[in-house]
Amino acid sequence: MDGTPKLACPWDRTEESLGNVVELQHVNLQVPDQLKATAFYISALGLTRDPYLMTGIDNMWANVGISQFHLPTGPAQVLRGTVGLVLPDRAQLLHRLDRARRWLEGTQYSFTEAEGHIDVTCPWGNRMRCHAPDADRLGRITLGMPYVELDVARGTLPGMARFYEQMIGTSTAMRDGALYVRVAREQFLIFRETDKPQPAFDGHHIQLAFVDFGGIYNRLNERGLISREDSAHQYRFIKVVDPNDGRVLFEVEHEIRSMKHPLFMRPLVNRNAAITNNYYAAGNEAAVWAMPPA
């Protein structure tokens, strides 16, 4: 209007928008046996026990890139779906998985090779899909948790898209018959419909961080969806509902943190799982979770 010419923009600026959800920090699953959990998450998968927090014998935080598994002691909880992991070396992973059999006999532990991934089942039935790094499909990471895929009932995806778009304020997209909900720069919740009967929700949770922490709280609270008030920095909800009619579509606990939470984007230690006392090179103990510049 002032005569200044409008600059042509060669980029789609909306591609850089994350919306209100900026972190998928952890998946929390109770485990009945910390030794077996260590054998699976640390020795078999090659993840890193958090050296600073939860260092006792009744809980373990296992680092995978910028995300974690939280593994408190209790009756086993099973996610109704699959946790996607990126791990840096397929051959080394297979070697670790094979060696871990000796510690995990008599449990549900198993693994199966497939083209492009390895499917792994934890001692209590949780499913992991382990991928090699792939920037085009999984983002520019060499170690991490790019997605959590959840099995849901037929006919629920349109309502779930409305919930995450209208109530939470993040973007969604349909890909290969599944609903992808963006929950961080290169992380997604994936909802995939199934005809298989699903067990009742058993209390496991995922943790997200919201930009509009208070605004989303108000929208959820107006519908009676807040399930727990944890602190000034944190609340929880369980029910995913269709905003159009209030119908409950799915249940999984969402632990929600603000960007002012003391643990938001806390840097995590990741080890190079290829290093052993017999196969060692100084200066190579730490793993880098992100790819170098392209």
Where are these regions (language model features)?
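Vicinal oxygen chelate
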Residues: 1-20, 22-32, 50-51, 60-67, 72-151, ...
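Conserved active-site tyrosine of GNAT-family acetyltransferases
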Residues: 37-42, 125, 159-167, 220
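Minor-groove-contacting beta-hairpin "wing" of winged helix-turn-helix DNA-binding domains
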Residues: 58-62, 179-181
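Solenoidal tandem-repeat scaffolds enriched in leucines and small polar residues
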Residues: 152-157, 161-162, 168-173
